Amino acid sequence: MALPLDAEASDQAIKEVKALAKITLTHKQYQCHNEIVYRESRWDLRAVGNIGGKKQAYGLYQMKLESLKTADHMRQYWKYWYYVVHRYGTTSHNDADYCKALHHLKTKGWQ
């Protein structure tokens, strides 16, 4: 699937990401997840960051994967989930540890 083309479809995609996160994460991890997305992209599926850097970052989570440039919202969600699990581990509830990822963002002073 590709990115939604209009504002209404983008709004629906964001609602779907939030709903998926809400049913798969604890409340605390859900809050951390949402703060990460807000900090990284302001919930913009088409966000492009690191413009002056060697590699641009794309999507909700600002990942430096060219394949995410046109990836739909669910692909972006699961790619980042996989990244967080492998980089920061899981919680006792087997959630991706978004709070550790958020802590890392804050300690590095990013966003």
State where each predicted segment sits.
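Export/targeting segments at the very N-terminus of extracytoplasmic proteins
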Residues: L3-W43
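Catalytic and binding regions of secreted/periplasmic enzymes and modules that target cell-wall glycans
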Residues: Q31, E35, R46, N50-Y61, ...
